[in-house]
Swiss-Prot record:
Keywords: ATP-binding, Cytoplasm, Cytoskeleton, Kinase, Nucleotide-binding, Nucleus, Serine/threonine-protein kinase, Transferase. It catalyses: L-seryl-[protein] + ATP = O-phospho-L-seryl-[protein] + ADP + H(+); L-threonyl-[protein] + ATP = O-phospho-L-threonyl-[protein] + ADP + H(+). Its main location: nucleus. PANTHER family: SERINE/THREONINE-PROTEIN KINASE IAL-RELATED. It holds the Pfam family Pkinase. Component of the chromosomal passenger complex (CPC), a complex that acts as a key regulator of chromosome segregation and cytokinesis. Has a role in error-correction of aberrent kinetochore-microtubule attachments to ensure that sister kinetochores become bioriented and connect to opposite poles by promoting spindle assembly checkpoint signaling. Ark1 is also required for phosphorylation of histone H3 that accompanies chromosome condensation and condensin recruitment to mitotic chromatin. Belongs to the protein kinase superfamily. Ser/Thr protein kinase family. Aurora subfamily. GO terms for biological process: attachment of meiotic spindle microtubules to kinetochore; interphase mitotic telomere clustering; meiotic spindle assembly checkpoint signaling; mitotic sister chromatid biorientation; mitotic sister chromatid segregation; mitotic spindle assembly checkpoint signaling; mitotic spindle organization; positive regulation of G2/M transition of mitotic cell cycle. Its EC number is 2.7.11.1. The keyword Nucleotide-binding applies. This is Aurora kinase. InterPro entries: Aur-like (IPR030616), Kinase-like_dom_sf (IPR011009), Prot_kinase_dom (IPR000719), Protein_kinase_ATP_BS (IPR017441), Ser/Thr_kinase_AS (IPR008271). Component of the CPC complex at least composed of ark1, bir1 and pic1. Interacts with the mitotic checkpoint complex (MCC) subunit mad3.
Length: 355
């Protein structure tokens, strides 16, 4: 696909695939505005100066404008879409770098609304033949509304780049927190796994399979809550089984390693791998001798859980890392598991005290 065809595809996406989700009510807008205001007061752009406090009314106004193109709500005069452009934003420090572009802290100039602006180079997307993957990411993520899923407010493009306007996750990548901590405490890990299960339950009810769960694709919000991101490998699969090999090697389930059909239950396996890595500090099937050895360990479910992992957490991990997808613990069971319940009161109380 040429750059021009990619541009045409994105233009079609803007009009033909609006979200069917209704605009949020005033109270939800206010909560989002207050949350963003807290982040404005705690971050700085490239000049290193703190941003000035912006009123709730301005934030509400900003959110209403951002919501319209996402929700696909036409004005009274007809389907007139709000056009975003790069000149609307003050670009700040880089937040991350990927293979095809970067993510920057940015501020909408008129309102002071803080976002993360993801830039993708069209030529590199075309060269790597992942245009459909990007389109799919936009289609899926723009329709999602969940507190533990990173929000996509909108998108636009120019001659060379595609820009995704994303929710700013104030505490950054979960992977970096895990690296610094080596491994998480049971209380912290159980909170994150509960929130992940909650987010995945929402996705699966919408027939969305994430397929690339790993610490690098999870961010933390300003209150330390999980924000699942990176929907490039996600699919909307209402009824069909899929055979595409995708995702990250350490997190691939046996059915994908073996080239078999797979369903949303691949995300259950990945949740088990994630639980293990949170508590141990490394994925369970990683083999330093190479990819082939890792594939074999996954296919055999060669699982060795260290003795310091408590029995109830071992039970959760073992019941998610089942070779047969149908035998894996459901997300509802995960959220009610004794290991989760044991710590839930503690992190729920701490969350309410900090809010």
């Amino acid at each position: 696909m040429s750059d021009s065809k990619l541009a045409d595809s994105l233009n079609c996406l803007s009009v033909s695939t609006p979200s069917t989700t209704a605009n949020p009510g005033r109270q939800q807008l206010l909560r989002l505005a207050v949350s963003n205001q807290r982040q404005v007061n705690n971050v700085s752009l490239a000049n290193g100066k703190e941003n000035k406090r912006t009123s709730n009314s301005k934030f509400n106004s900003s959110l209403r404008k951002i919501e319209e193109p996402i929700a696909g709500v036409p004005s009274s005069a007809g389907p007139q879409w709000r056009e975003f452009h790069i000149g609307m934003f003050e670009i700040g420090k880089p937040l991350g770098k990927g293979k095809f572009g970067r993510v920057y802290l940015a501020k909408e100039k008129k309102t002071g609304f803080i976002v993360a602006l993801k830039t993708l180079h069209k030529s590199e997307l075309v060269q790597s033949k992942i245009e459909k993957q990007v389109r799919r990411e936009i289609e899926i993520q723009s329709n999602l509304r969940h507190k533990n899923i990173l929000r996509l407010y909108g998108h636009f493009h120019d001659e060379k780049r595609i820009y995704l306007i994303l929710e700013f996750a104030g505490r950054g990548e979960l992977y970096q927190h895990l690296r610094r901590a080596k491994r998480f405490s049971e209380e912290v890990a159980s909170k994150y796994i509960f929130q992940m299960a909650n987010a995945l339950s929402y996705l699966h009810k919408k027939h969305v399979i994430h397929r690339d769960i790993k610490p690098e694709n999870i961010l933390l919000g300003i209150d330390g809550e999980i924000k699942l991101s990176d929907f490039g490998w996600s699919v909307h699969a209402p009824s069909n089984r899929r055979t595409t090999l995708c995702g990250t090697l350490d997190y691939l389930p046996p059915e994908m390693v073996e080239g078999k059909e797979h369903t949303e239950k691949v995300d259950l396996w990945s949740l088990g791998v994630l639980t293990y890595e949170f508590l141990v500090g490394a994925p369970p099937f990683e083999d330093m001798s190479g990819h082939s050895a890792t594939y074999k360990r996954i296919a055999k479910v060669d699982l060795k859980i260290p003795s310091f992992v408590p029995p109830d957490a071992r039970d959760l991990i073992s019941r998610l890392l089942q070779h047969n997808p149908e035998k894996r613990m459901s997300l509802e069971q995960v959220m009610r598991h004794p290991w989760i319940v044991k710590y839930k009161d503690s992190w729920t109380r701490k969350s309410s005290e900090s809010s």
